[in-house]
């Protein structure tokens, strides 16, 4: 169905708004994908914070002008599905990679993040990026590791000097006085 000018402007405005907020973009070839596969992918996209849309390349190209994804404009050729990660940079990569496992017709064509375009093979790299929660857990571990190592060193010194378990030794006199 052909879009009139006002509908095209709405599509461009919607995509431009999404592109301005997005962390990453993956454009994938989807020709031959069944309706059921697309429906499942759209459902998963909503759950993971990915904006997924099939739109004419000229409209997508206009929408990304002035954003960090403008570098991908010359590669927007052929029937493409656009996946913008809105919450986590790797979400679109994980979505496309997971959907491609059950659908050999779905192939990443463009991977863009941080104002740079990468080969389609980098979808695996993007998919392997940790989620926000995983990154925070890694950071917490890095921050607590020196304190943990210091506590272990103190305990080892106490045990080497014959003190045994310092906490248990301190608890014994308290138990005797009670």
UniProtKB/Swiss-Prot annotation:
One of its GO terms (biological process) is translation. Pfam families: Ribosomal_L10. InterPro entries: Ribosomal_uL10, Ribosomal_uL10-like_sf, Ribosomal_uL10_bac, Ribosomal_uL10_bac_type. The keyword Translocase does not apply. GO terms for cellular component: ribonucleoprotein complex; ribosome. Keywords: Ribonucleoprotein, Ribosomal protein, RNA-binding, rRNA-binding. One of its GO terms (molecular function) is large ribosomal subunit rRNA binding. The keyword rRNA-binding applies. Part of the ribosomal stalk of the 50S ribosomal subunit. The N-terminus interacts with L11 and the large rRNA to form the base of the stalk. The C-terminus forms an elongated spine to which L12 dimers bind in a sequential fashion forming a multimeric L10(L12)X complex. Forms part of the ribosomal stalk, playing a central role in the interaction of the ribosome with GTP-bound translation factors. Belongs to the universal ribosomal protein uL10 family. This is Large ribosomal subunit protein uL10. It comes from Stenotrophomonas maltophilia (strain K279a). The lineage of its organism: Bacteria, Pseudomonadati, Pseudomonadota, Gammaproteobacteria, Lysobacterales.
